[in-house]
Amino acid sequence: MKTIKYSLITLVAFILCATNSNAQMAKSAYFLDGSFYNHQLNPAMKPERAYFSLLTGTWSVAANSNFGISNFLYPYGDDKLTTFMSSHVDQDEFLNALPNSLQMSSDISTNLLGLGFRMFGGFTTFGITLNSSVSTNLPKGFFEFAKKGFQESSYSFSGINMNTMNYASINLGYSREVVEGLRVGVTAKYLVGLAYANFNVDKLNIEMSEDKWMIESHATAEAALYTEMSVDAGAMDDLNEPRIPLADVLSNTTDVNTIMQAAKPAAKGLAFDLGVSYDFGDLVDGLSVSASLLDLGSINWQYMTKFSTEDGKVEFDGIDEIDPNDFEGSLDKELEALGEDIEKMFSIPYSHGTQAYRTKLSPVMYLGAEYNMPFYHGLSVAMLYGKRFATYGGWDEVRGYVNLAPLKWIEASANVGYSTYGTTFGWMFNFHPRLFSFFIGSDYMVTKVTPQYIPVNNINGHITFGITKPIGKRK
């Protein structure tokens, strides 16, 4: 039993550790009028001036989870810790503190180029960005099995997932006021896929009885890279099978046409951001509302390699072929055979070949409202609701803001949010005089860590910063 337990726990650790560091746009900047990039959260938002940035516009890194180390380590004795597996930890206390699905997600984004200017009675934006997202999902059943063991006769671990999407986008946006107070905006994004991978266990069930165990599983995986050249490995002039990577093409040929054809992206797509904002003006002085839908689109991968397991079962009815003259040797052979069966069950050897495949982006919705104080227009309070639509790695969040702008070129925001990943504190400082603009902030703050700087509670951390060159006067 310990062998199977530790095999499954090892799989859990691998999936959790596979999560990479990643980022998202700063929601803390949503209501700051001096921000040059809140149009990425709502295309209807108009920067106060034209602007330009190269490589320094925005850098953002974030990671979130709905669990932390405090879910698995418990105080014991005098200044000691023990794991959830200890008999001193009550199983109901441990399991009731866990969410049904343990989620971890992360995002990285950066603006390589940013440009904004007034045109045709509105405001036009152009940008090139890099985006990377990773999400993992683990069912609670894993830890229920590890803690309870034989107390239950069956366990289901279906719903294990690990996904990563990496792409570049070329963005063109436009916004304008259509009637007094009402502003609309749209951003079109041409997407270039860089890498994609998805691992999903849609069935993993364990049935246990006194005389045998039965494990049933099915898993799938898909993977694609930026470009995978279809070239004859010898002649280098036949664009048919077998395919070889672009790096090998560059090392074996100097023909410009061959290299250019090899460098064509293997994945392309299109997405749109939509936004609207309304200032109530004299109807309700100081009140404005806004809404946006982001990442409505998909990427088409030309060379997606797909794998799957066949529906498999592993049955273990005990160890009965023990040689009394070689107890340790024969026991090792039995356990080794069992381990090989489990390894085969989790391996994904069956390839369905390379084929075109479409992956949808995970859309995000924002609904916002802001009220400027009548006694001091540099002070406002606001609320923002956000939702990410995704099978795995989705979230809901409500965030309350206090925004302060004591001078035209200095503004700050402090906010508190409650989301799928718990309660968090965010902040943003924006310094934007005439010659340059600098901002730094965070949507998620880690408030408690171990002596080894490991977050104690939910792993919610984020940092974003950037420098932009303003152009022209405020308007």
Q: What residue spans do the PLM features occupy?
A:
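Bacterial Sec-dependent N-terminal signal peptides
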Residues: 1-27, 369
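Subset of outer-membrane beta-barrel
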Residues: 24-475
